[in-house]
Structures are given as C-alpha cells and as structure tokens.
C-alpha cells in the first residue's frame, strides 16, 4: 500500500453566498458593495450607538428559497444570535448570525456521476443553512499603523451553507461547489460570483488512517479561497501536508490556514477557534419571526425545475452536449436568454426551409455558449452582461448564418464588433452591410494566388488530398477579405488553380 493510500481524506465545506437583494439585511442602505468605498453605508452598518436593526423581508424570502432548493427542512421561526469577536471589519464587536436555530437544516444536494463529474452518485448532506450579515473588508494596507476599511459590504445579506464532512476527494468538493453555484443562480438567489467575492468558501480538511477510518484526527480550516479551482488545489495540498506529517511521525494540529498562490502551499494564519470563543448570545433587538407553512409554500411555488431536470431537457435537444448545457446553466441569466433566443429564432426562420430552420437551431449551443458568452467575458474594456445583445439580434445573426447569407467568419466578426460597441455596431446594420458587399473577383484571385505562392508545403499537401488543408486556405482568405468573400467561390478558385495545375503535369 502506498503512503497516500494508507490515508482517507475527509473534507467539509462552509460556503458563504451573498443574496441578490436591493437593500442590506438590517438597514435601508443599498446592497451595492462593489461601488466606491463607503458609498453604500448606513449608520447601523457602522454600528453608531442607538441604531437598531430593521429586518429586510426580501432577504428572508431569498434565504428561505435557498434552503428549499437545497432540500432543507425549514425552521418554524427565524431567530438571530450575536457572534462576538473583535476585528476591524466588524465595528459592533459581534456579527448577527444564527446559531441556536438555523433557517434550514437536514438538507441535501444530489451529485450525479453522469452530469456532475463525480466518480459515483452521492448525496451531499447540508447540515444547516443560516442567514447572517456580511462584514466590512480591508481594501488596502499601507503600513502596520494604517488600515483602510470599506463598509459597503457590512450588513449585506449572506447565507452560510454548511455541509457534512462527506467529501473524500478535492475533486468531488469542487464538483459540489459548481453544482451549488448553478442551483443558486437558477433560483435567482444570488449571482454567486466568486471572482467578485459574492460566493466564498472555507474548507475543513482532515485525514484518517485507512485501517481505522472512524478515528478522526485534527481538522484544519482553509480560509479565503477565491475560486473553485483554488478550493480543489488548496485542499489537495493541505491533505498531502497532513499526510506527510503523519508519515514522518508528527500529527496535524487544529488551526486556520490559507492558500499562498506564489508558494503553491497552505500557510498558517492563526490557531483555530471553537464555538465557545465567540460567546454566542441571542440577538435581543430582533424578535422571533414566524415562518408559517403558507409562507414557505408560497416561496416553494416560485422554484422552477431542478438543475438535473434542466440538463436532461437540454440534452434531449440532441444538438446540446453536456459541456455546453452545463456552461449555459452556469452562466448568469443564460437559461432565460436561451429560452427567449429560441422563440426569436423561430420568428426569423419561419419563412425559411425546414432544413435551414433545423440548421439554425443546431447553431445555438456553439454561438451562444462559446462565441457570445466568450465575447462578453473577453470584451476589451470591461466584461459584458448577456443583455448586451438582445436575443432577437442574435437570432437575426444565426438565421442569416444558417441560410448562407453570412459565412461563419463574417458572423464571428460581426458578433465581436457588436459586443465591443453595441450602440455603434448594430447587428442588423452589420449583417445587411455584409450581405450587400460585393468582393471584387480579381482581388479575390490575387488573395488566393498570393497564399498559394507563399505556402508551397500546404499546396503540396492539398494536391495529395490531405484533409483540412483546403479549409486552412479558405479560412485565411476569409480573414483577409474581412468575411466578405464567399467560401464556395474561394474553394472553386483554389481547386481551379491547384488541382488543374496538378492535372496538367
């Protein structure tokens, strides 16, 4: 048995997710924590004496919805507690959270081997889901004597999702996080963007001997992990660190660590705190809030199909593969955009032949998920949202691509221009300009001849019938003609020039 095989890795997750509310949890300040520092702050958020919490009902509703989509049992009433600690980002000296009675308990998220990338089907136990306020954050440290604080994030509504220590590989933990992220996005509970800090994850890692798996050793907490990828990497490194200690005769100790990207290692932060260190007390300024069965049922009615059901529906379309279907559901507003796009494409292609209609429909996954979403993410000045280009405009582009009015290269070029400057570059305008553009045949011949003369090796490959070479020539001519040359005409010229020359020898 190898040194690694002698040990069983156990991982539990604590996932913090900001709710998509307009206002903060206990004040009337806007929940806009990514604006200019301290521009969205109320007196309560910075704990001025005499200020009292005002509960945001929208936050309670979204938290209840989150608990339901995680299959939790809902508490009959909502009670809050104070978690006491002293830190600069929490001016009150305590955080309002839930300890005695979490909003949701005994939930689960189902991981499917065929859909979620795990080795085998499993139910991830959700121990609890609680509603709490977020803290402020440190935005810059100039020196040891000066710390700048931003309280925009303070009191933004947050849910904490706590799993059982049920993962035995970092990969499965990462698969769960992707699934949870998709579930919460589709429920419109949160955008769950880890890159913005709207979803954050702490990881608890321990190892046990394979010969005595019930004997748990020390648990180490990993904090401040900014992405799912880093969760997987850091968990793997921490497990290996603990195993190395054990193999060398030492033992891990309970502590809090973080992941250092430059060192590619976990590093010590502080000794691990226990519940008694936080001196939990009931929050006396917020009375108990009853959650009636009628209220919970009303929230439940707003929940749509599950992620697995939506994936199965997309995969039944035949032209969706699993990767594209998952990417669509993981994209913020991706599903709703797709649903509108399908209807708009039907309108655009209604007068076209059934073959063209089917071709247009098959274009959707690649052009929506790979091209459009990719262009939005890689816009030169700033990342774009899906509403940059209305579904009707994208449908018009795909319809003209399907019926042969546009080449694939021209369509890509038009889409990129429209994403970069949607006000200046209307898709309708660009498509019509391209359709009406005539590319001079003599110029086209010159482009073809120039490529042929400069690429003798590819010409020889074309002569012996190597696959893909003809497409290379066509693609290069399309780029040089800004997509205006017709692929069939390019193909004809190349064949006439190269193959006729070959047959004459």
Swiss-Prot record:
Give the EC class as a word: ligase
Which superkingdom does the taxonomy of this entry point to? Eukaryota
For this protein, what reaction is catalysed? L-glutamyl-tRNA(Gln) + L-glutamine + ATP + H2O = L-glutaminyl-tRNA(Gln) + L-glutamate + ADP + phosphate + H(+)
Entry GO terms, CC: glutamyl-tRNA(Gln) amidotransferase complex; mitochondrion
Q: Where in the cell is it found?
A: Mitochondrion
Could you tell me one molecular function GO term of this UniProt entry? glutaminyl-tRNA synthase (glutamine-hydrolyzing) activity
Tell me one GO biological process term: mitochondrial translation
EC numbers on record:
6.3.5.-
A Pfam match is: GatB_Yqey
- Where mainly found? mitochondrion
Gene3D superfamilies of this UniProt entry? 1.10.10.410
Identify the keywords attached in UniProt to this record, alphabetized. Answer: ATP-binding, Ligase, Mitochondrion, Nucleotide-binding, Protein biosynthesis
Under the heading NCBIfam families, the entry gives: gatB, PRK05477.1-2
Q: What else is known?
A: This protein may be expected to contain an N-terminal transit peptide but none has been predicted.
The UniProt function text for this chain reads:
Allows the formation of correctly charged Gln-tRNA(Gln) through the transamidation of misacylated Glu-tRNA(Gln) in the mitochondria. The reaction takes place in the presence of glutamine and ATP through an activated gamma-phospho-Glu-tRNA(Gln).
Tell me the subunit arrangement.
Subunit of the heterotrimeric GatCAB amidotransferase (AdT) complex, composed of A, B and C subunits.
Similarity comment: Belongs to the GatB/GatE family. GatB subfamily.
What is the protein named?
A: Glutamyl-tRNA(Gln) amidotransferase subunit B, mitochondrial
Q: Which organism is it from?
A: Schizosaccharomyces japonicus (strain yFS275 / FY16936)
């Amino acid at each position: 048995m190898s040194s690694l095989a002698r040990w069983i890795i156990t991982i539990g997750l604590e996932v913090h997710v900001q709710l998509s509310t307009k206002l903060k949890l206990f004040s009337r300040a806007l929940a806009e924590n990514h604006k200019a520092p301290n521009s969205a702050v109320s007196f309560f958020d910075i704990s001025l004496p005499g200020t009292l919490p005002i509960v945001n009902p929208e936050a309670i509703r979204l938290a209840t919805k989150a608990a339901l989509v995680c299959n939790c049992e809902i508490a009959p009433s909502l009670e809050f507690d104070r978690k006491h600690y002293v830190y600069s980002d929490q001016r009150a000296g305590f955080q309002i959270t839930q300890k005695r009675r979490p909003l949701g308990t005994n939930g689960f998220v189902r991981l499917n081997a065929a859909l979620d990338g795990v080795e085998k089907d499993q139910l991830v136990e959700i121990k609890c889901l609680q509603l709490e306020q977020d803290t402020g954050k440190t935005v810059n440290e100039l020196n040891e004597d000066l710390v700048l604080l931003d309280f925009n994030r303070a009191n933004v509504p947050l849910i904490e999702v706590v799993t059982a220590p049920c993962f035995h590989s970092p990969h499965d933990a990462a698969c769960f996080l992707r699934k949870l992220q998709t579930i919460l996005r589709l429920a419109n509970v949160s955008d769950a963007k880890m890159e913005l800090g709207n979803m954050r994850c702490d990881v608890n890692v321990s190892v046990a001997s394979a010969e005595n798996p019930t004997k748990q050793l020390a648990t180490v907490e990993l904090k401040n992990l900014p992405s799912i990828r880093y969760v997987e990497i850091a968990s793997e490194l921490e497990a290996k660190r603990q195993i190395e200690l054990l193999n060398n005769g030492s033992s891990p100790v309970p502590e809090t660590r973080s992941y250092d990207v430059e060192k590619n290692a976990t590093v010590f932060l502080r000794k691990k705190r226990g519940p008694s260190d936080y001196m939990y007390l009931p929050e006396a300024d917020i009375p108990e809030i009853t959650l009636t069965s009628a209220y919970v049922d009303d929230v439940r009615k707003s929940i749509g199909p599950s992620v697995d059901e939506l994936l199965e529906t997309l995969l039944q379309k035949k032209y969706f593969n699993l990767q594209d279907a998952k990417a669509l559901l993981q994209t913020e507003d991706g599903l709703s955009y797709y649903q509108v796009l399908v209807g708009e494409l039907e309108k655009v292609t209604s007068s076209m032949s059934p073959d063209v209609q089917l071709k247009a429909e098959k274009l959707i996954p690649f052009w929506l998920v790979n091209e459009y979403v990719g262009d939005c993410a890689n816009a030169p000045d700033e990342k774009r949202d899906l509403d940059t280009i209305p579904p009707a405009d994208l449908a018009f582009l795909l319809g003209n691509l399907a019926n042969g009015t546009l080449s694939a290269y021209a369509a890509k070029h038009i889409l990129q221009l429209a994403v970069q400057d949607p006000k200046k570059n209307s898709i309708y305008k660009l498509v019509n300009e391209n359709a009406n553009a005539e590319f001079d045949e003599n110029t086209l011949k010159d482009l073809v001849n120039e490529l042929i003369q400069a690429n003798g090796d590819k010409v020889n490959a074309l002569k012996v019938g190597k696959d893909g070479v003809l497409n290379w020539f066509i693609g290069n001519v399309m780029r040089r003609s800004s997509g205006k040359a017709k692929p069939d005409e390019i193909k004809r010229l190349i064949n006439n020039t190269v193959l006729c020359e070959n047959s004459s020898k």
